[in-house]
Amino acid sequence: MELKDYYAIMGVKPTDDLKTIKTAYRRLARKYHPDVSKEPDAEARFKEVAEAWEVLSDEQRRAEYDQLWQHRNDPQFNRQFQQHEGQPYNAEDFDDIFSSIFGQHGRHSHHRHAARGHDIEIEVAVFLEETLEEHQRTISYSVPVYNAFGLVEREIPKTLNVKIPAGVSNGQRIRLKGQGTPGENGGPNGDLWLVIHIAPHPLFDIVNQDLEVVLPLAPWEAALGAKVSVPTLKERILLTIPPGSQAGQRLRIKGKGLASKKHTGDLYAIIKIVMPPKPDEKTAALWQQLADAQSSFDPRQQWGKA
């Protein structure tokens, strides 16, 4: 197995800044989101993009990855890295690879006293809809077994059925005690940490506990008011649009955001005025009548930023 080229996966250059990489991540995550993409390998591509983002978005991990990439053809590196086949990036795993490449001693030398096992950290992708209720998830991962020099000797596959609580947030860490690597000489096992990654949604943006959704309106709906159907995470609801609504105006839908133990956020519908196609002769005449009736209105009377 070769070290994955995360820059190629994201379609960026190693010299690109974080802003460029983030833009690429959001674009690809939306493109391969299983709820949107019809491509047969969408889910695999989505997970691959998420794995690349997990590394390249962290300054320290990115620096370690860049250094590993420079040494990817080192025979000793390849022997160590092959033992991690099929696993996502894990900083602790790569510590052992660094040790073997750069001649450093591993963490576990010939100590005979009881030592606690390593913690293991894996990322769990969660869709927004799944945050509404507690749900079961089957987690598969590998537990590394270290030799006396602190290098990974082999890995033992492990599967757990775990509960993902309602209201989890992006970056939240869930501890599963004792599910990490075994302790040494009677020491306690390490822990397994599940790091929650909220997958980008094709409709909703997350702002703390609140959600935002773009609400397209026809000009007459904004001008005259209307009742329109708006999606939420659970169902569609009817929202009353007040007369004279403006583009960019935020309409609050209370209690339809993300829920946590202490607080439930709101959903904000952000108005976007959508013009109809090029008008025919009859429609153009109606627009002209409106223009004549509102001849004193000057939208550029006061200038300002959008």
Curated annotation (Swiss-Prot):
The gene is cbpA. It comes from Salmonella typhimurium (strain LT2 / SGSC1412 / ATCC 700720). It comes from the Bacteria. GO terms for molecular function: bent DNA binding; unfolded protein binding. This is Curved DNA-binding protein. PROSITE patterns: DNAJ_1, DNAJ_2. It is found in: Cytoplasm, Nucleoid. CDD domains: DnaJ (cd06257), DnaJ_C (cd10747). One of its GO terms (biological process) is protein refolding. GO terms for cellular component: cytoplasm; nucleoid. DNA-binding protein that preferentially recognizes a curved DNA sequence. It is probably a functional analog of DnaJ; displays overlapping activities with DnaJ, but functions under different conditions, probably acting as a molecular chaperone in an adaptive response to environmental stresses other than heat shock. Lacks autonomous chaperone activity; binds native substrates and targets them for recognition by DnaK. Its activity is inhibited by the binding of CbpM. Residues 5-69 form the J domain. Keywords: Chaperone, Cytoplasm, DNA-binding. HAMAP family: CbpA. Pfam families: DnaJ, DnaJ_C. Disulfide bonds: none annotated.
